[in-house]
Structure formats: structure tokens, C-alpha cells
Design a protein with these regions (language model features):
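Short, intrinsically disordered, charge-balanced linker/junction segments flanking boundaries
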Residues: 174-179
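Positively charged, amphipathic and often flexible ligand-engagement surfaces
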Residues: 1-173
Length: 179
């Protein structure tokens, strides 16, 4: 999930590692994100949790588990305005819950960043596109990753062979080394 997922999968294949450094199913990444969020809330006396997301389920999860906590959301200018504005308007807190940022930088750094965001958020499966599809109902937008995971026959995505297996049955993938 996210802008670097494809490159992490590709690098794992190039290096011929035993397993991928990222989850091969989005729902597993979502569940991991939720577990990390709970850990941030647990240590709130040492840190100030800030959650950058435009996923409606993730936002609802944070709102529910952060009811009695102080935190903030973060989003890129122009992304998920409607849902973040809703939470800001209807929250019972006396502070602004969403920090909006606009990326800045030199051309060589900024353009690749913006392209990754465009690719990530332009995907047909992205929350941003789902939110703007009037044919989808709320249950198709708010997807509980635990329910999704419970329906899997196996945790590993069967559509993505492990790095050593990408050339099977012809041959096993070799180990790669970054010289």
C-alpha cells in the first residue's frame, strides 16, 4: 500500500530475498497501520500522535480509538477535503484536528514525490476514487481489514509469487547483490 509498494516488491524480486519487505495484501498493511496507531496512543504521554491518511476507515478507526486522546490528522492539500472537514466540524474537541500541508522543494525532489502521490491516489482502487464514485455505497468504501483478512484462504497473496519463485517452473530466482 502506498507510493513505494511497487518499488519494494520489485527490489525484493531483484535481490531474490526469501520474502518481501512489505505486505502483499493491502488489508494486511491497513491492519498493521491500525496496530501502530494503537501503539502511538499507548505512548501518548511521550509523543504527540499525528496520522496522515485519506482512508475513510482509517480515519473512523482513529476517531473511535482516540475519543479521549489528543492527536491530529494530516493530509495533502486537495486530498480527502470532504471527510477531514467533516471530522473537524463534528468533533467535540477544542482544537483543529487536521493539519494540511503542501509539499515544497527543488524540482528533482518534488516532481518524483508528486508523481508517486498521483500514481497512488489515481489508482482505480484508491479511496479517493471510491469516494467520488456515486455507484458505491458506504460499505464498499469503509472496508474493515480484519473482515477481509478473515476471508483469505492464505495470508500471502497468491497472485504475487515469493521472490525465489518468480521464474518457476523454469528455474528458481538467483540471489541478487547490490554492488
Amino acid at each position: 500500500k502506498g507510493a513505494y509498494w511497487d518499488s519494494e516488491i520489485k527490489l525484493g524480486q531483484e535481490l531474490g530475498v526469501e520474502n518481501y519487505p512489505v505486505f502483499t495484501r493491502k488489508s494486511l498493511t491497513d491492519l498493521s497501520w491500525m496496530a501502530c496507531a494503537l501503539k502511538l496512543f499507548k505512548y501518548q504521554n511521550h509523543i504527540f500522535p499525528a496520522f496522515a491518511t485519506h482512508n475513510a476507515y482509517s480515519i473512523a478507526f482513529i476517531e473511535e480509538f482516540g475519543k479521549d486522546k489528543i492527536f491530529e490528522f494530516q493530509r495533502i492539500h486537495g486530498m480527502a477535503d470532504v471527510i477531514h472537514n467533516y471530522f473537524n466540524k463534528y468533533s467535540n474537541d477544542n482544537y483543529q484536528k487536521c493539519r494540511i500541508y503542501a509539499p515544497v522543494g527543488n524540482y528533482d525532489d518534488l516532481l518524483p514525490y508528486l508523481m508517486r502521490r498521483l500514481l497512488e491516489n489515481g489508482a482505480n482502487t484508491s479511496f479517493v476514487n471510491k469516494m467520488n464514485d456515486p455507484k458505491l455505497d458506504i460499505d464498499e468504501i469503509l472496508i474493515d481489514p480484519i473482515k477481509t483478512i478473515n476471508n483469505y484462504k492464505q495470508i500471502k497473496n497468491p497472485q504475487i509469487p515469493l521472490p525465489p519463485e518468480i521464474f518457476l517452473p523454469e528455474r528458481e530466482n538467483s540471489k541478487g547483490y547490490d554492488l
